[in-house]
Amino acid sequence: MATVEVTPAVTALPENETADEVTKPQEPQPEAAVAAPPAPAEPVTEEPEKAAPEAVEAPEEPAATDAKDPAEVAEAEEEVVEEPQEVPEEPVAEAAAKEVEATEGKAEPTGEMKDKTPEATDAPEAPAAAEEPTDAPEAPAVAEEPTNAPEAPAVGEEPEAKEGKPDEAVEEASTEVPVDKTEE
């Protein structure tokens, strides 16, 4: 018996391309696809009345900060540094409070905390949907319903002539037990 040696297929890649670049389809660049908005017909400029007061007020602000006492500037910088430290503490405290409430059963756990609660792991499985009763009544099967029309003969057969009243023919064709009308 001859021995067959199987080797995996090797694809040659150019030196400057990786396998990811080769396997991904080329997508159009979003910058190339977006057209530049049309230039406005007239350039928009601010009214000279509004521009002049802003230009006058802007140089005054740096002069006012330079006139402050260096101790006041240092205190202002410390206050700015302290505020970001307080902000992270609030969400941590809120998360801890929520966790305490969830473990005490006062609040519904959410997210990752919901999966870690004992109720989620120890709760019995809900009954299957097929076992639950429904309010809708069952519809009777089509074959069970009595019909007033005579049964159609099979293809190629002639219809049988029935003697008697039409009500009797319906009772004979019915699958239900006929009711004796004389007993009533």
From Swiss-Prot:
Domain of life per record: Eukaryota
Bilayer-crossing regions: none
Disulfide cysteine pairs (residue numbers): none
Low complexity bias spans: 25-36, 53-65, 120-156
Acidic residues: bias regions: 72-92
Disordered: annotated span: 1-184
UniProt biased composition (Basic and acidic residues): 96-119, 159-168
Record family assignment: To H.brasiliensis latex allergen Hev b 5.
Protein's name according to its UniProt entry: Fruit protein pKIWI501
Organism: Actinidia deliciosa (Kiwi)
Lineage of the species this protein comes from: Eukaryota, Viridiplantae, Streptophyta, Embryophyta, Tracheophyta
